[in-house]
Protein backbone atom coordinates (compact mmCIF):
# COMPACT_ATOMS: atom_id res chain seq x y z
CA UNK A 1 0.00 0.00 0.00
CA UNK A 2 1.02 3.62 -0.44
CA UNK A 3 0.78 6.82 1.64
CA UNK A 4 1.84 10.42 1.01
CA UNK A 5 3.60 12.43 3.71
CA UNK A 6 1.90 15.74 4.48
CA UNK A 7 3.79 16.66 7.66
CA UNK A 8 7.59 16.36 7.64
CA UNK A 9 10.10 15.81 10.43
CA UNK A 10 9.43 12.34 11.85
CA UNK A 11 11.63 9.25 11.58
CA UNK A 12 10.52 6.83 8.90
CA UNK A 13 9.64 4.04 11.36
CA UNK A 14 7.58 6.40 13.53
CA UNK A 15 5.82 7.95 10.53
CA UNK A 16 4.92 4.51 9.21
CA UNK A 17 3.54 3.41 12.59
CA UNK A 18 1.64 6.68 13.08
CA UNK A 19 0.10 6.83 9.60
CA UNK A 20 -0.76 3.17 9.02
CA UNK A 21 -2.26 0.32 11.06
CA UNK A 22 1.23 -1.26 11.31
CA UNK A 23 2.76 -1.46 14.75
CA UNK A 24 6.18 0.16 15.32
CA UNK A 25 7.72 -3.33 15.56
CA UNK A 26 6.25 -4.50 12.25
CA UNK A 27 7.20 -1.19 10.62
CA UNK A 28 10.83 -1.64 11.71
CA UNK A 29 10.88 -5.23 10.49
CA UNK A 30 9.65 -4.19 7.06
CA UNK A 31 12.21 -1.36 6.86
CA UNK A 32 15.09 -3.72 7.78
CA UNK A 33 13.91 -6.23 5.17
CA UNK A 34 13.82 -3.55 2.48
CA UNK A 35 10.07 -3.82 2.04
CA UNK A 36 9.49 -0.10 2.66
CA UNK A 37 10.29 2.30 -0.18
CA UNK A 38 10.47 6.08 0.00
CA UNK A 39 10.01 7.61 -3.44
CA UNK A 40 10.98 4.22 -4.86
CA UNK A 41 14.17 3.80 -2.80
CA UNK A 42 15.00 1.77 0.31
CA UNK A 43 15.70 3.93 3.39
CA UNK A 44 16.79 3.27 6.98
CA UNK A 45 14.45 3.63 9.95
CA UNK A 46 16.20 6.84 11.05
CA UNK A 47 15.47 8.57 7.71
CA UNK A 48 13.57 11.83 8.31
CA UNK A 49 10.46 11.98 6.15
CA UNK A 50 9.84 15.06 4.02
CA UNK A 51 6.62 16.63 2.85
CA UNK A 52 5.53 15.02 -0.40
CA UNK A 53 7.43 11.75 0.19
CA UNK A 54 5.61 8.71 -1.17
CA UNK A 55 6.00 5.71 1.14
CA UNK A 56 5.19 2.19 -0.05
CA UNK A 57 4.82 -0.67 2.42
CA UNK A 58 3.46 -4.21 2.55
CA UNK A 59 0.29 -5.29 4.29
CA UNK A 60 1.45 -8.46 6.10
CA UNK A 61 -0.17 -11.75 5.25
CA UNK A 62 -2.56 -12.86 7.93
CA UNK A 63 -1.42 -15.81 10.02
CA UNK A 64 -4.29 -17.92 11.27
CA UNK A 65 -4.39 -18.25 15.03
CA UNK A 66 -6.08 -20.82 17.20
CA UNK A 67 -8.75 -18.68 18.83
CA UNK A 68 -11.96 -20.66 19.00
CA UNK A 69 -15.30 -19.36 17.80
CA UNK A 70 -17.75 -19.38 20.70
CA UNK A 71 -21.50 -18.99 20.64
CA UNK A 72 -21.60 -16.19 23.21
CA UNK A 73 -24.33 -13.55 23.47
CA UNK A 74 -23.32 -10.58 21.31
CA UNK A 75 -25.24 -7.31 21.12
CA UNK A 76 -24.72 -6.22 17.50
CA UNK A 77 -25.90 -2.62 17.14
CA UNK A 78 -25.06 -2.28 13.43
CA UNK A 79 -23.59 -4.46 10.69
CA UNK A 80 -22.92 -4.19 6.95
CA UNK A 81 -20.33 -5.63 4.56
CA UNK A 82 -17.51 -3.52 6.02
CA UNK A 83 -18.24 -2.66 9.64
CA UNK A 84 -19.80 -4.09 12.78
CA UNK A 85 -20.66 -2.02 15.86
CA UNK A 86 -21.07 -4.04 19.04
CA UNK A 87 -22.20 -3.13 22.54
CA UNK A 88 -19.73 -4.97 24.82
CA UNK A 89 -20.99 -6.01 28.25
CA UNK A 90 -19.07 -5.14 31.39
CA UNK A 91 -16.72 -7.94 32.42
CA UNK A 92 -15.92 -9.20 28.91
CA UNK A 93 -12.29 -9.07 27.76
CA UNK A 94 -11.90 -7.80 24.18
CA UNK A 95 -8.97 -9.95 23.01
CA UNK A 96 -7.65 -13.36 24.17
CA UNK A 97 -4.47 -13.28 26.25
CA UNK A 98 -2.74 -15.33 28.92
CA UNK A 99 -5.41 -16.09 31.47
CA UNK A 100 -8.22 -15.07 29.10
CA UNK A 101 -8.19 -17.61 26.27
CA UNK A 102 -11.95 -17.93 25.96
CA UNK A 103 -15.11 -15.97 26.62
CA UNK A 104 -13.72 -12.85 24.95
CA UNK A 105 -15.29 -10.50 22.42
CA UNK A 106 -12.98 -11.93 19.75
CA UNK A 107 -14.24 -15.47 20.45
CA UNK A 108 -17.80 -14.22 20.06
CA UNK A 109 -16.99 -12.31 16.87
CA UNK A 110 -15.40 -15.38 15.30
CA UNK A 111 -18.71 -17.18 15.73
CA UNK A 112 -21.14 -14.42 14.76
CA UNK A 113 -19.15 -12.60 12.05
CA UNK A 114 -17.42 -14.79 9.48
CA UNK A 115 -15.36 -12.22 7.53
CA UNK A 116 -12.98 -10.16 9.66
CA UNK A 117 -9.86 -8.12 9.01
CA UNK A 118 -6.28 -9.09 9.85
CA UNK A 119 -3.70 -6.36 10.36
CA UNK A 120 -0.01 -6.58 11.41
CA UNK A 121 0.10 -10.16 10.16
CA UNK A 122 -2.14 -11.55 12.89
CA UNK A 123 -5.82 -12.34 12.82
CA UNK A 124 -7.27 -10.00 15.41
CA UNK A 125 -10.84 -10.23 14.24
CA UNK A 126 -11.36 -6.68 13.12
CA UNK A 127 -10.45 -5.03 16.42
CA UNK A 128 -9.75 -1.37 15.56
CA UNK A 129 -9.78 -0.08 19.15
CA UNK A 130 -10.38 -1.58 22.57
CA UNK A 131 -12.17 -0.82 25.80
CA UNK A 132 -11.24 -2.28 29.17
CA UNK A 133 -12.71 -5.50 30.53
CA UNK A 134 -14.66 -3.63 33.21
CA UNK A 135 -15.90 -0.94 30.80
CA UNK A 136 -19.13 -1.53 28.88
CA UNK A 137 -20.25 -0.01 25.60
CA UNK A 138 -19.65 0.53 21.92
CA UNK A 139 -16.78 -0.79 19.80
CA UNK A 140 -16.30 -0.66 16.03
CA UNK A 141 -15.05 -3.77 14.27
CA UNK A 142 -13.71 -4.02 10.70
CA UNK A 143 -14.78 -6.87 8.40
CA UNK A 144 -11.99 -6.34 5.86
CA UNK A 145 -8.50 -4.82 5.75
CA UNK A 146 -9.55 -1.78 3.70
CA UNK A 147 -12.14 -0.85 6.31
CA UNK A 148 -9.62 -1.52 9.10
CA UNK A 149 -7.04 0.83 7.56
CA UNK A 150 -9.60 3.60 7.03
CA UNK A 151 -11.07 3.34 10.54
CA UNK A 152 -7.63 3.17 12.17
CA UNK A 153 -6.48 6.26 10.27
CA UNK A 154 -9.62 8.12 11.36
CA UNK A 155 -8.84 7.27 14.98
CA UNK A 156 -5.24 8.47 14.60
CA UNK A 157 -6.45 11.68 12.94
CA UNK A 158 -8.81 12.25 15.90
CA UNK A 159 -11.82 12.41 13.57
CA UNK A 160 -13.91 9.69 15.20
CA UNK A 161 -16.34 10.47 18.02
CA UNK A 162 -16.03 8.57 21.31
CA UNK A 163 -18.06 9.70 24.31
CA UNK A 164 -18.31 7.91 27.64
CA UNK A 165 -20.49 8.25 30.69
CA UNK A 166 -18.91 7.73 34.10
CA UNK A 167 -19.87 8.03 37.73
CA UNK A 168 -16.87 9.57 39.47
CA UNK A 169 -15.99 10.31 43.08
CA UNK A 170 -16.55 13.79 44.46
CA UNK A 171 -17.89 16.98 42.90
CA UNK A 172 -15.96 18.46 39.99
CA UNK A 173 -15.38 22.20 40.55
CA UNK A 174 -16.21 23.06 36.92
CA UNK A 175 -19.17 21.99 34.79
CA UNK A 176 -16.92 21.38 31.81
CA UNK A 177 -13.23 21.32 31.03
CA UNK A 178 -10.29 19.60 29.39
CA UNK A 179 -7.64 17.35 30.91
CA UNK A 180 -4.38 17.49 28.98
CA UNK A 181 -1.72 15.31 30.60
CA UNK A 182 0.65 12.76 28.98
CA UNK A 183 0.10 9.10 29.84
CA UNK A 184 2.64 6.28 29.92
CA UNK A 185 3.42 3.10 31.83
CA UNK A 186 3.71 3.65 35.57
CA UNK A 187 7.26 3.35 36.93
CA UNK A 188 5.88 2.19 40.29
CA UNK A 189 3.56 -0.51 38.93
CA UNK A 190 4.24 -1.80 35.41
CA UNK A 191 0.70 -3.17 35.14
CA UNK A 192 -0.73 0.33 35.45
CA UNK A 193 -0.61 3.56 33.48
CA UNK A 194 0.13 6.99 34.93
CA UNK A 195 0.46 10.66 34.07
CA UNK A 196 4.16 11.05 33.33
CA UNK A 197 6.36 13.50 31.45
CA UNK A 198 7.71 10.53 29.46
CA UNK A 199 4.23 9.54 28.31
CA UNK A 200 2.36 10.16 25.07
CA UNK A 201 0.07 13.20 24.68
CA UNK A 202 -3.42 12.52 26.03
CA UNK A 203 -6.49 14.78 26.00
CA UNK A 204 -9.89 14.14 27.60
CA UNK A 205 -12.80 16.60 27.58
CA UNK A 206 -15.48 16.39 30.26
CA UNK A 207 -18.94 17.79 30.94
CA UNK A 208 -20.90 17.38 34.16
CA UNK A 209 -24.35 15.85 33.59
CA UNK A 210 -25.61 15.43 37.15
CA UNK A 211 -24.34 15.89 40.72
CA UNK A 212 -25.12 13.63 43.70
CA UNK A 213 -23.24 15.01 46.70
CA UNK A 214 -20.30 12.61 46.92
CA UNK A 215 -20.51 11.49 43.28
CA UNK A 216 -20.88 13.10 39.85
CA UNK A 217 -22.18 11.78 36.53
CA UNK A 218 -19.93 13.07 33.74
CA UNK A 219 -19.72 12.74 29.98
CA UNK A 220 -16.16 12.30 28.74
CA UNK A 221 -14.94 12.69 25.18
CA UNK A 222 -11.66 11.17 24.05
CA UNK A 223 -9.40 13.29 21.86
CA UNK A 224 -6.72 10.59 22.06
CA UNK A 225 -6.89 6.89 22.91
CA UNK A 226 -4.24 5.96 25.46
CA UNK A 227 -4.55 2.81 27.55
CA UNK A 228 -6.81 3.45 30.58
CA UNK A 229 -6.94 7.14 29.54
CA UNK A 230 -10.21 8.18 31.19
CA UNK A 231 -9.48 6.21 34.35
CA UNK A 232 -5.96 7.68 34.68
CA UNK A 233 -7.04 11.25 33.87
CA UNK A 234 -9.96 11.24 36.31
CA UNK A 235 -7.79 9.81 39.09
CA UNK A 236 -5.14 12.42 38.24
CA UNK A 237 -7.56 15.31 38.88
CA UNK A 238 -8.80 13.70 42.09
CA UNK A 239 -12.10 12.31 40.81
CA UNK A 240 -11.51 8.61 40.03
CA UNK A 241 -14.15 6.47 38.36
CA UNK A 242 -16.42 4.80 40.92
CA UNK A 243 -15.66 1.11 41.24
CA UNK A 244 -12.30 1.36 39.46
CA UNK A 245 -10.25 -1.50 40.94
CA UNK A 246 -6.88 -0.09 39.83
CA UNK A 247 -7.06 3.70 40.05
CA UNK A 248 -9.91 4.31 42.49
CA UNK A 249 -10.16 4.27 46.29
CA UNK A 250 -11.09 1.14 48.22
CA UNK A 251 -14.15 2.91 49.62
CA UNK A 252 -16.50 3.21 46.64
CA UNK A 253 -19.87 2.01 45.34
CA UNK A 254 -19.55 -1.62 46.40
CA UNK A 255 -19.97 -4.81 44.41
CA UNK A 256 -21.23 -3.34 41.16
CA UNK A 257 -18.11 -3.07 39.03
CA UNK A 258 -16.63 -0.05 37.32
CA UNK A 259 -19.03 2.73 36.31
CA UNK A 260 -17.61 3.62 32.91
CA UNK A 261 -19.64 3.14 29.72
CA UNK A 262 -18.74 3.88 26.07
CA UNK A 263 -22.09 5.45 25.21
CA UNK A 264 -21.57 7.23 21.87
CA UNK A 265 -19.51 6.17 18.86
CA UNK A 266 -19.30 8.08 15.59
CA UNK A 267 -17.15 7.61 12.48
CA UNK A 268 -17.07 8.01 8.71
CA UNK A 269 -18.09 4.86 6.87
CA UNK A 270 -14.97 3.57 5.06
CA UNK A 271 -16.83 2.73 1.84
CA UNK A 272 -19.70 5.23 1.54
CA UNK A 273 -18.23 8.25 3.31
CA UNK A 274 -21.45 8.56 5.33
CA UNK A 275 -21.19 9.87 8.89
CA UNK A 276 -22.50 7.22 11.28
CA UNK A 277 -23.28 7.76 14.96
CA UNK A 278 -24.54 5.23 17.48
CA UNK A 279 -25.67 5.41 21.10
CA UNK A 280 -25.93 2.61 23.65
CA UNK A 281 -27.71 3.39 26.89
CA UNK A 282 -25.94 2.54 30.15
CA UNK A 283 -26.37 -1.01 31.53
CA UNK A 284 -29.21 -1.72 33.95
CA UNK A 285 -26.92 -1.78 37.02
CA UNK A 286 -25.50 1.62 36.01
CA UNK A 287 -29.02 3.08 35.65
CA UNK A 288 -30.15 1.52 38.95
CA UNK A 289 -27.15 3.08 40.71
CA UNK A 290 -28.04 6.49 39.26
CA UNK A 291 -31.59 6.07 40.59
CA UNK A 292 -30.24 5.17 44.04
CA UNK A 293 -27.92 8.19 44.03
CA UNK A 294 -30.83 10.48 43.10
CA UNK A 295 -32.76 9.21 46.10
CA UNK A 296 -29.80 10.13 48.31
Feature locations, PLM:
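RNA pseudouridine synthases
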Residues: 1-296
Amino acid sequence: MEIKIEVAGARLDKALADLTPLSRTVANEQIKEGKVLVNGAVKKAKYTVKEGDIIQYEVPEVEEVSYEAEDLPLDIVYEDQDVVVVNKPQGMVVHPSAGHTSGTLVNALLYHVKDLSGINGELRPGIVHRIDKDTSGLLMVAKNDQAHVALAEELKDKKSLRKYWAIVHGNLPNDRGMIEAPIGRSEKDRKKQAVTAKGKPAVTRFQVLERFGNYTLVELQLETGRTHQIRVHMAYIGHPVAGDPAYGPKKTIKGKGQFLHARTLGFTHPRTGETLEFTAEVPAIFEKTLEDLRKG
